Amino acid sequence: MKATRKQLTQRRHFRIRRRVEGTGDRPRLAVFRSHKHIYAQVIDDEKQHTLVAASTLDKDLKGELASGGNISASTAVGNLIAKRALEKGITKVVFDRGGNLYHGRVKALADAAREAGLDF
């Protein structure tokens, strides 16, 4: 039986997670993309603790976005996650694309976070 897109994404994510780990000095910027929304978290894997989070469902973004599943929404989430991380003193992160291809919404979020001041 042929693997579904979801299964292929999960396989890629397992391979990525074997190599990518967030520390206290350089936490992991994890991205989850659903059909209608996009979510980003900055995670310290040593303490298993989420330091900062942002998504298209966030109160700060919910009113100004027409849709949560497009590139402009991803750019807004990238800017918001970078702003919140910088407020907590986090400047360097490791990018975890969550098994998604580095293209489209995931790339837009990463580019926006870089432009807003995160280093990865």
From Swiss-Prot:
CDD domains membership: Ribosomal_L18_L5e (cd00432)
Keywords: Ribonucleoprotein, Ribosomal protein, RNA-binding, rRNA-binding
GO MF, any single term: 5S rRNA binding
Keyword Amino-acid biosynthesis found: no
Keyword Electron transport listed: no
InterPro entries: Ribosomal_uL18_bac-type, Ribosomal_uL18_bac/euk
GO biological process, one term: translation
One Gene Ontology CC term in the entry: cytosolic large ribosomal subunit
Pfam families assigned: Ribosomal_L18p (PF00861)
Subunit relationships: Part of the 50S ribosomal subunit; part of the 5S rRNA/L5/L18/L25 subcomplex. Contacts the 5S and 23S rRNAs.
Biological role: This is one of the proteins that bind and probably mediate the attachment of the 5S RNA into the large ribosomal subunit, where it forms part of the central protuberance.
Family: Belongs to the universal ribosomal protein uL18 family.
Protein's recorded name: Large ribosomal subunit protein uL18
Native organism: Picosynechococcus sp. (strain ATCC 27264 / PCC 7002 / PR-6) (Agmenellum quadruplicatum)
